[in-house]
């Protein structure tokens, strides 16, 4: 260990020019280069897993021919009054429910489709 400490002390006492000359001599003696080695890029990071959507919006696209049944279903689903439900149905496309889970969105779509409406889930 004493030899290593002596080498460290000698290297520490070198000037910048002497250290540069030492590097050149070591490169030629060992057949290496002190240039930074370019690190090859690793494989591309795996694409982030696609998060499954947890909140859905049920959109009434078209009320269809049976508006009265669709209005009744809209009232049952949303709790809106008769006028508000009628305005929603006649103003299609409109959001019926927002921020519902997948099962509820599917159930609402099935109810409205059974009443004659065209429904989208977004």
From Swiss-Prot:
One of its GO terms (biological process) is translation. SUPFAM superfamilies: ClpS-like (SSF54736), Ribosomal protein L7/12, oligomerisation (N-terminal) domain (SSF48300). Signal peptide: none annotated. CDD domains: Ribosomal_L7_L12. GO terms for cellular component: cytosolic large ribosomal subunit. Transmembrane segments: none annotated. The keyword Ribosomal protein applies. It comes from the Bacteria. Keywords: Ribonucleoprotein, Ribosomal protein. GO terms for molecular function: mRNA binding; structural constituent of ribosome. Homodimer. Part of the ribosomal stalk of the 50S ribosomal subunit. Forms a multimeric L10(L12)X complex, where L10 forms an elongated spine to which 2 to 4 L12 dimers bind in a sequential fashion. Binds GTP-bound translation factors. PANTHER family: 39S RIBOSOMAL PROTEIN L12, LARGE RIBOSOMAL SUBUNIT PROTEIN BL12M. Belongs to the bacterial ribosomal protein bL12 family. Forms part of the ribosomal stalk which helps the ribosome interact with GTP-bound translation factors. Is thus essential for accurate translation. This is Large ribosomal subunit protein bL12.
């Amino acid at each position: 260990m004493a030899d290593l400490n002596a080498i460290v002390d000698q290297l520490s006492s070198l000037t910048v020019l002497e250290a540069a000359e030492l590097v050149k001599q070591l490169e030629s003696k060992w057949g290496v280069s002190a240039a930074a080695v370019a690190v090859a890029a690793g494989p591309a990071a795996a694409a982030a897993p696609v998060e499954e959507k947890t909140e859905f919006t049920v959109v009434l696209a078209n009320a269809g021919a049976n508006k009265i049944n669709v209005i009744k279903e809209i009232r049952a689903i949303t709790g809106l009054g008769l006028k508000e439900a009628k305005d929603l149905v006649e103003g299609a496309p409109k959001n019926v429910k927002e921020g519902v889970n997948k099962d509820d969105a599917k159930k609402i779509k099935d109810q409205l489709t059974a009443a004659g409406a065209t429904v989208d889930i977004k």
